[in-house]
Amino acid sequence: MNEAATVLGTADIQEILKLLPHRYPFLLVDRIIEIDSDNSAIGIKNVTANEPHFTGHFPEKPIMPGVLLIEGMAQTAGAICARKTGGGSNLVYFMTIDNARFRKPVVPGDRVEFHVVKQKQRGNIWKFHCDAKVDGQLVAEADIGAMIVSKEDV
């Protein structure tokens, strides 16, 4: 772990489980290696061959569905929002997706890094620019919006 990540903050799987309501098979962030307050984060997803979506996408040439890359970005952004606004006492709803682009396939054995950067925040609405990278190469990108809602209001 580098010194900057220690200063900025990290989240292991136990903390992620406290921040996000997602569970297997839909929890798509294994670890967060860097969190800069409410401004940015880098989440990690270790892609393995035994994930359920690979049985049908595609049996002879498994490729991680692009929608799951977007969801991993959203979960990383959601962890920032949840951590900043009271942890597990709130829900973070994924609201919008714009400018999504998929550049390269993600396959079993890849380690995806979800880089999310807050673009703006107004009240309980947050906007992020997100990149997904494998071995430093851009594989997907999108702009996403999220809304924070108290669990009591749901």
From Swiss-Prot:
GO terms for molecular function: (3R)-hydroxyacyl-[acyl-carrier-protein] dehydratase activity. SUPFAM superfamilies: Thioesterase/thiol ester dehydrase-isomerase (SSF54637). Keywords: Cytoplasm, Lipid A biosynthesis, Lipid biosynthesis, Lipid metabolism, Lyase. GO terms for biological process: fatty acid biosynthetic process; lipid A biosynthetic process. GO terms for cellular component: cytoplasm; membrane. Disulfide bonds: none annotated. Its EC number is 4.2.1.59. It catalyses: a (3R)-hydroxyacyl-[ACP] = a (2E)-enoyl-[ACP] + H2O. HAMAP family: FabZ. NCBIfam families: fabZ (TIGR01750), PRK00006.1 (NF000582). Belongs to the thioester dehydratase family. FabZ subfamily. Involved in unsaturated fatty acids biosynthesis. Catalyzes the dehydration of short chain beta-hydroxyacyl-ACPs and long chain saturated and unsaturated beta-hydroxyacyl-ACPs. This is 3-hydroxyacyl-[acyl-carrier-protein] dehydratase FabZ. It comes from Sinorhizobium medicae (strain WSM419) (Ensifer medicae).
